Amino acid sequence: MAIKDWPEGEAPREKLLSQGVKQLSDAELLAVLLRVGLKGLSAVELARIMINEFGGLRSLLNASQAQVCRLDGIGPVKFAQMQAAVELGARISQENLKRGKILSDPDLTRDYLMRQLSDRAYEVFAILLLDSQHRVIQFVELFRGTINSASVYPREVVSLVLEKKAAAVIVCHNHPSGIAEPSTADRRITERLKQALQTIDVSLLDHMVVGDREIVSFAERGWID
């Protein structure tokens, strides 16, 4: 059945307007962007096929034009609509953590880091530099590759902190496996960084590990004391 033939209030766009965007499933949200499906497939059914084909919404939205347009019914226009939606979300996230923004909402930080790091195919170790009022100075990617206790150099972190005159920092890195659970090596790195930063009287507020669907906070687990 085509979406236009659905009972009033059940079609994704009408459901969004009447119940709010958060009430829509991933497939329904994507269907709003797609607008139409294929012969014999509604936009929601097409969206569900697309999500399943890529193993999830995030993988679909991070796929290349060539990969996405191999799917029946998906051409450059639909791909462009999807990319525009992704970029709008990314820009809103960046605006929320722009320079001078006071970092008072943990959810904003999580959303920003998820957008920055969750789709990387390799490990990235980064640092969010803050002033004494916990206002954002800069987000910097420091190390790439296999992140372990031997590849993260505290002296480089300290050097950057001094250069930017930061008073506090949040460090973060991603797990390309998609599993955010910190490793023993992650905990060792954190302790080394904490000790190094203490020598220059800078606070390590948190170490966040980014997976596909979640972020694990060392501070929330009581590991930054």
UniProtKB/Swiss-Prot annotation:
Biological process annotations from GO: proteolysis
Q: Which Pfam families match?
A: RadC, UPF0758_N
Q: Which InterPro entries match?
A: MPN, RadC_JAB, RuvA_2-like, UPF0758, UPF0758_CS, UPF0758_N
Which residues are Zn(2+)-binding?
A: 173, 175, 186
Domain MPN, which positions?
Answer: 102-224
Supply the alphabetized keyword list.
Hydrolase, Metal-binding, Metalloprotease, Protease, Zinc
GO terms of molecular function: metal ion binding; metallopeptidase activity
Q: Which domain of life is it from?
A: Bacteria
Motif placement: JAMM motif = 173-186
Has the keyword Metal-binding been applied to this entry?
yes
PROSITE patterns reported in the protein's UniProt record: MPN (PS50249), UPF0758 (PS01302)
* Keyword Cell inner membrane attached: no
Please name the CDD domains in this protein's record: MPN_DUF2466
In the record, the note on similarity to other proteins reads: Belongs to the UPF0758 family.
Q: Can you name this protein?
A: UPF0758 protein Spea_3837
Q: What is the protein's species of origin?
A: Shewanella pealeana (strain ATCC 700345 / ANG-SQ1)
